[in-house]
């Protein structure tokens, strides 16, 4: 497809030069470009195909970047990136050195707020609106938030706060793509949306209230009648109770509805009409039939041929850790009726599809509500059940107070299965599970485990489930090393590691590795070159102090390796144990550096952090001044 109009758009100012009649042609080109780009790089697709018209209308009506536009989560911001000067960089999407898959302030002035975690946009936009007022600047702040993100309490906290400011130029756009509310279509709905957003409606409403104010009972009756009538036209008046003027729902793919409605909304906001709430209904995967039919499959695909669609992948030779968890969850649920499974809106990503099918009465999807998920699990535990919370490491950060106050303080037996621990690749720093070891091990009563392979993951999950205290098992994205997985549900001894490789008896300095989780395999690779000992520590807390002391006694140098923040992580736990025992031993701690690691190929990112086998070996030799291995050069043959 040619992109005659799209190629002319290098900034929203170019978009605003187009005739209104050209916008639909631009939308068709933009949607095709999104599909072409994502099919070549991988990335989020369904959500971006669904926001094409909305993105065009927002940049056409609002004076971005002076008017602030905040995308909640941000995985639906590809059309926004394309229209704001990054069209040619889409080929670098989510790659090392390329553009991010989420809004990023350092990437463009049009990315006014960095997002990736859900439900933050209204708070940020409110802060921007009040910041502009404080500075005496007249602009509109717009938050675009999805219906899924509206399940989080933070969004409603922001709405509750925003409603206090009756004349604030704040706009919230609810992008309802779940189709739970079918959009009224046609001329009547378009007319109603324009009417409810226009000055005539506002002036008439205000005038009637002024007239009827002399007769309070009549005014109260009129207000109740208006609320009842409006409640019949729109799906909810809840947002008006928060102090917003609610408009919609309108068709989010109809530019002839979107543009005039947004124009009226912007005008009202700037003229003191107060916070505005626009409800638009869109369809995930819009315009690409395969994605429309299966938006979940096309939510975040890898590279594929758009003409053929996503082909079923060949069955991998090795199971992913997510699959290992899903299998264990079903097996343990069959063995113990007390088990209940909880996910904050990540059924597929966390491997709970089969569990929901087999045990629907013991499966709870609480929505994007991590705080609630943690405390909800605590409540279940109080009744004698054994909750397992399947959650990404990065998202558990959102329920940290609940983790401490509602679970650990009461020593409730909740299992946290932490998927995506460590680096996650293309999603970048916002989704990396870099901090869980550091933020979990400092909590009293908490047990923290780090499996090094598939079978150990199953064993440690069983071990966690058998405890009478809160536990966490962290495992990485993707496949393990290919260990055979036992069918039983055997645990391992609590707080005990195991030596995977013993150093040889040859002369030289002896190095002992204390490796945690995913770093056991690269440590073994480095150990072959160094002839070092490797201990698979398994537990960060309780740490196997006896094994630490033994390695310290038998080796000249110790090296800790973890795929997590080196500050406050497992290496710090080892150093604390040595200090407590009064042992003075040279220790090198290796892990993720004190910076946010960007997006890119996971193996490449580990290499950049020095956490591949070669990088670990190099760090050990440099730190302890060990000789490089001798390389024998074959004689040249004449």
Curated annotation (Swiss-Prot):
Binds 1 Mg(2+) ion per subunit. SUPFAM superfamilies: Thiamin diphosphate-binding fold (THDP-binding), TK C-terminal domain-like. InterPro entries: Dxylulose-5-P_synthase, THDP-binding, Transketo_C/PFOR_II, Transketolase-like_Pyr-bd, Transketolase_BS, Transketolase_C, Transketolase_CS. It catalyses: D-glyceraldehyde 3-phosphate + pyruvate + H(+) = 1-deoxy-D-xylulose 5-phosphate + CO2. Pfam families: DXP_synthase_N, Transket_pyr, Transketolase_C. One of its GO terms (molecular function) is 1-deoxy-D-xylulose-5-phosphate synthase activity. It is an enzyme of class 2 (transferase). Keywords: Isoprene biosynthesis, Magnesium, Metal-binding, Thiamine biosynthesis, Thiamine pyrophosphate, Transferase. Mg(2+) binds at residues 147, 177. One of its GO terms (biological process) is isopentenyl diphosphate biosynthetic process, methylerythritol 4-phosphate pathway. Pathway: Metabolic intermediate biosynthesis; 1-deoxy-D-xylulose 5-phosphate biosynthesis; 1-deoxy-D-xylulose 5-phosphate from D-glyceraldehyde 3-phosphate and pyruvate: step 1/1. Thiamine diphosphate binds at residues 75, 116-118, 148-149, 177, 288, 370. One of its GO terms (cellular component) is cytosol. Its EC number is 2.2.1.7. Its cofactor is Mg(2+); thiamine diphosphate. Homodimer. Catalyzes the acyloin condensation reaction between C atoms 2 and 3 of pyruvate and glyceraldehyde 3-phosphate to yield 1-deoxy-D-xylulose-5-phosphate (DXP). PANTHER family: 1-D-DEOXYXYLULOSE 5-PHOSPHATE SYNTHASE-RELATED, 1-DEOXY-D-XYLULOSE-5-PHOSPHATE SYNTHASE, CHLOROPLASTIC. NCBIfam families: dxs (TIGR00204), PRK05444.2-2 (NF003933). Belongs to the transketolase family. DXPS subfamily. This is 1-deoxy-D-xylulose-5-phosphate synthase. It comes from Cupriavidus taiwanensis (strain DSM 17343 / BCRC 17206 / CCUG 44338 / CIP 107171 / LMG 19424 / R1).
């Amino acid at each position: 497809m040619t992109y005659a109009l799209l190629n002319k758009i290098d900034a929203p100012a170019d978009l605003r030069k187009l005739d209104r009649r050209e916008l639909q042609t631009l939308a068709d080109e933009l949607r095709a470009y999104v599909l072409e780009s994502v099919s070549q790089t991988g990335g989020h697709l369904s959500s971006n195909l669904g926001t094409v018209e909305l993105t065009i209308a927002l940049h056409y009506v609002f004076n971005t970047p002076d008017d602030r536009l905040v995308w909640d989560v941000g995985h639906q911001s590809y059309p926004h990136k394309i229209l704001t000067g990054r069209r040619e960089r889409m080929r670098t999407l989510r790659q090392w050195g390329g553009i991010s898959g989420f809004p990023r302030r350092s990437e463009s002035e049009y990315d006014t707020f960095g997002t990736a975690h859900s439900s933050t946009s209204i708070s940020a936009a409110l802060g921007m609106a009040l910041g502009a007022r404080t500075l005496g600047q007249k602009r509109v702040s717009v938050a675009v938030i999805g219906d899924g993100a509206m399940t989080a309490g933070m969004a409603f906290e922001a709405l509750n706060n925003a409603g206090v400011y009756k004349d604030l130029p704040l706009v919230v756009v609810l992008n309802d793509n779940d189709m739970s509310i079918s959009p009224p279509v046609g001329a009547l709905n378009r007319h109603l949306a324009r009417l409810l957003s226009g000055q005539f409606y506002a002036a008439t409403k205000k005038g009637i209230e002024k007239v009827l104010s002399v007769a309070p009972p009549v005014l109260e009756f009129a207000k109740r009648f208006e609320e009842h009538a409006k409640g019949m036209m729109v799906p909810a008046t809840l947002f008006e109770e928060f102090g917003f003027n609610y408009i919609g729902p309108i068709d989010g793919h109809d530019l002839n509805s979107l543009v005039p409605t947004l124009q009226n909304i912007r005008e009202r906001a700037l003229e003191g009409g107060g916070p505005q709430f626009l409800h638009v209904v869109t369809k995930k995967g819009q315009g690409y039939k395969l994605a429309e039919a299966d938006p979940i499959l096309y939510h975040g695909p890898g590279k594929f041929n758009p003409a053929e669609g996503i082909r079923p992948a060949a069955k991998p030779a090795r199971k992913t850790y997510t699959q290992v968890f899903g299998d264990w969850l079903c097996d343990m649920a069959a063995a113990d009726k007390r088990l209940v499974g909880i996910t904050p809106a990540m059924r597929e990503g966390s491997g709970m599809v089969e569990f929901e099918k087999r045990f629907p009465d013991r499966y709870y999807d609480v929505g994007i509500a991590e705080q609630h998920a943690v405390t909800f699990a605590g409540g279940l535990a109080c009744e004698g059940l054994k909750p397992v919370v399947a959650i990404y490491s990065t998202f558990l950060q959102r329920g940290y107070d609940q983790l401490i106050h509602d679970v650990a303080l009461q020593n409730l037996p909740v299992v946290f299965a932490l998927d995506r621990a460590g680096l996650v690749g293309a999603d970048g720093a916002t989704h990396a599970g870099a901090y869980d070891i550091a933020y979990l091990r400092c909590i009293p009563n908490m047990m923290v485990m780090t499996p090094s392979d598939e079978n150990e993951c199953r064993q440690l999950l069983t071990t966690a489930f058998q405890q009478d205290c809160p536990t966490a098992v962290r495992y990485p994205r993707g496949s393990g090393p290919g260990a055979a997985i036992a069918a039983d549900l055997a645990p391992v001894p609590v707080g005990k590691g195991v030596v995977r490789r013993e150093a040889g008896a040859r002369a030289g300095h002896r190095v002992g590795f204390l490796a945690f989780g995913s770093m056991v395999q690269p440590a073994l690779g480095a150990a072959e070159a160094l002839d070092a000992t490797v201990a698979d520590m398994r537990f960060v807390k309780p740490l196997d102090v006896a094994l630490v002391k033994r390695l310290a006694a038998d080796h000249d140098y110790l090296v800790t390796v973890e795929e997590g923040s080196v500050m406050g992580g497992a290496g710090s736990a080892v150093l604390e144990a040595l200090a407590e025992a009064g042992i003075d031993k040279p220790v090198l701690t290796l892990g993720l550096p004190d910076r946010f690691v960007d997006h890119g190929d996971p193996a490449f990112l580990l290499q950049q952090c020095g956490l591949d086998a070669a990088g670990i070996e190099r760090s050990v030799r440099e730190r302890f001044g060990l000789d490089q291995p001798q390389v024998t050069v074959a004689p040249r043959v004449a």
